[in-house]
Amino acid sequence: MDKRLNAICGDAIEELSKLENGIVDLIVTDPPYNLNKNYGTSQDKLEFEEYLEFSRTWLNEAKRVLKPDGTIYVFMGMKYISYIYTILEQELGMTFNSWITWFYTQGIGKTKGFSPRHDDILMFTKNPKKFFFDLDSIRVPQKYYRSVNNMRGANPGNVWEFSHMHYCNKNRKKHPTQKPDRKSTRLN
């Protein structure tokens, strides 16, 4: 198996348009959540329909470059996750596989309402039966010892508890929405 990893950083629509059809095995993407955050280069606030059209455009390009057995993981906050799901399944005809909840202990402080403590990750594939998923590489220790069944470890499930990459963490880079490495290794 070819284990090359090519990370492409840049404007998704622009960079994806440079790629040929059907050449990418895996896409892991963390698009803007459209929450009016300033990330230094642009404001993250589009009108509702404009944001959905932006999402349709880059998701269509992502599907185009995926191999027939390719997989896409999309990180998204709660405000637009259902719309992204609908675009992928209903408009682009991709196959839903998993809805992962990333639970973290440090949330955004709020005085009116509950503090957000999770983000969502959607897993979609182009083919419902033929796609790569290496469960053995991401197993977690069994909670209870059993001498039967799968002692190699358990499926980690779809609720993942990982802390944010805190701003004072020595491994923190300059990316404004950096994800913890341990979480990213589960996306295969």
Model-assigned labels for residue ranges:
Residues 1-186:
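Core catalytic lobe of class I
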